[in-house]
Design a protein with these regions (language model features):
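Flexible, processing/modification-adjacent segments and terminal tails
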Residues: 31-37, 106-180, 204-207
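Bacterial Sec-dependent N-terminal signal peptides
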Residues: 1-35
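Catalytic loop of the DD-peptidase/beta-lactamase superfamily, centered on the K-T-G motif
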Residues: 93-106, 111-129, 237-252
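Short, surface-exposed loop and linker segments with low hydrophobicity and enrichment for Pro/Ser/Thr
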Residues: 14, 46-56, 79, 165-166, ...
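N-terminal mature ectodomain segment of secretory-pathway/periplasmic proteins
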Residues: 37, 44-113, 150-158
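Intrinsically disordered terminal and processing segments
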Residues: 34, 41, 45-49, 92-94, ...
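Gly/Pro-enriched, hydrophobic low-complexity segments
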Residues: 161-253
Length: 253
């Protein structure tokens, strides 16, 4: 009996040592790469020639919402000239926001004078134009945009299983005045391609959304995610899908 007891005790100790070693190994494996190193590798995958800063093109985007409605948008971006234009269909009309440097032009079916009701219905404000400029250049410029001033790249990289797949996860926050949300970017551990990103307005409340990326469009040497499916963090409810149907060269302005 005594001999058996010692065997069991030794076996228990070995199991504990194995578990401890496994946990230490798992943690160190994720930390073979730092946050900045992961970001560098991801940018090398998506923009190997460093062309994003000179991006000049038009994105044709189809947005399909959960209720089946479709919205078509054309987004033209010339980063070098600080040019941005969004043209989108809304309620049977075409809304356009054009920004060149600090000059903003708002249009509704080509006209630039609006009633108060039109301004409210179609969100025809300069603030909205700036928001949409930041929205599209950020989302379609990832992961390169994570090099922008104000981004705080956490040094720790987490290895995490999400939706049945394993990823390297980079955490990013922003300096005050730049952004308030907490962001998490999920990269393929082999290719370093960006596969998912997730944001929280308040992590404690588990609010916000996650966006699943599939397929790619290659334009000017940049690998741009083609399809983005949006879901709520809480409950995983499906919201919408943005599909990049075409990328074309932007004609000279």
């Amino acid at each position: 009996m005594k001999h058996s007891f010692y065997h069991k005790k030794a076996g228990t100790i070995l199991i504990k040592i194995f578990i401890l070693c496994f946990c230490v190994f798992s943690k160190s494996y994720a930390q073979e790469i730092t946050g900045q190193q992961l970001l560098k590798k991801a940018i090398q995958y998506h923009d190997p020639k460093g062309n994003w800063d000179q991006f000049k093109g038009t994105l044709a985007i189809s947005m399909q919402s959960a209720d089946g409605k479709e919205r078509l948008s054309d987004v033209s971006i010339d980063l070098a000239k600080q040019f941005f234009k969004l043209s989108t269909a809304k309620n049977g009309k075409t809304v356009a926001y054009t920004i060149l440097n600090d000059k903003i032009v708002l249009q509704l079916d080509g006209k630039t004078d609006f009633t108060e009701e039109e301004i409210k219905t179609y969100n025809l404000t300069e603030a909205r134009a700036r928001f949409m400029q930041n929205y599209y250049t950020y989302l379609y410029g990832l992961p390169m945009k994570l090099n922008d001033p104000g981004a705080i790249i956490y040094p720790e990289v987490e290895r995490k299983v999400f939706l049945g797949q394993e990823y390297l996860v980079l955490r990013v926050k922003y300096e005050e005045g730049t952004g308030k949300d907490s962001w998490f970017f999920y990269f393929d551990p082999k290719t370093y391609a960006l596969k998912i990103y997730q944001f929280y307005h308040d992590e404690a409340k588990k609010d916000g959304e996650y966006i699943v990326l599939t397929d790619e469009e290659n334009f000017s040497g940049i690998k741009i995610p083609k399809t983005r499916a949006w879901y709520l963090n809480q409950g995983g409810n499906y919201l919408a899908t943005d599909t990049l149907t075409k990328v074309s060269k932007l004609e000279a302005k």
